[in-house]
Amino acid sequence: MAFKFVIFAAVVAVARAGLIASPAVSYAAAPALVAAPVAKVAYAAAPIAKVAYAAQPEEYDANPHYSFSYGISDALTGDSKSQQESRSGDVVQGSYSVVDPDGTKRTVDYTADPHNGFNAVVRREPLAAKTIVAAAPVATKVIAQPAVAYAAPVAKTISYAAPVATKTYVAQPALSYAAPLTKTYVSQPALSYAAPVAKTISYSAPLATKTYVSQPAISYAAPLAKTYVSQPALSYAAPAYAYHH
């Protein structure tokens, strides 16, 4: 506003100068001009008028009718079930079936009406055994193998000759003392052999032969009598010396 006022005063002065004699020209520095602060313009979003929606009244069917059905049969997972239902006014009729894990089919028939309420009848029936269709045989080339025959082993009868047990007893020589010589004989222990499988082994009874050696005759020779012979008398003859001249 101050800037506008200065300009307006200058214009008035110029207009008056044309009517009044010109005074002495003098020059003065122009006053410093200061810009007035400009107020910031604030922008606000225009308010959006809310649209009011009137609630629509729900449609009411005094005599409803519908009917639906579905079924699932999955051979991979074994899931098999179905359902169907229909309605006429306030009376509902329907049924559903499902295959239980024990292999029986369970079917439920149900009805509902304002007078009798809800009623259901359950039926169980075994499923028919599945018919397995055998795959057509594939022709294969068969090569006949030669028949291999193995002769049954012949059971051999092996006989073992029983060893002849020979017992030899050597009589002890009579010693110088008079104590009697006592001999003790131990009986042969009984031996038993288990027969091997598929082998017939026969043993002949051992032949025990006892050989006794007679007591050696001991003779003592009479001691030799020593004869002492007297020493012969020895005589020495003096040699005869002869000297010849």
Swiss-Prot record:
Keywords associated with the record: Cuticle, Repeat
Transmembrane segments: none
One GO term describing the cellular component: extracellular matrix
UniProt key word Transferase: no
Region of interest: Disordered: 79-100
GO MF term list: structural constituent of cuticle
UniProt remark on domains: The tetrapeptide (A-A-P-[AV]) repeats found throughout the protein are also present in many proteins constituting the protective envelope of other species.
Listed PANTHER family: CCP84AC-RELATED, STRUCTURAL CONTITUENT OF CUTICLE
Described function: Component of the cuticle of African malaria mosquito.
Protein name: Cuticle protein
Protein species of origin: Anopheles gambiae
Primary gene name: Ccp84Ab
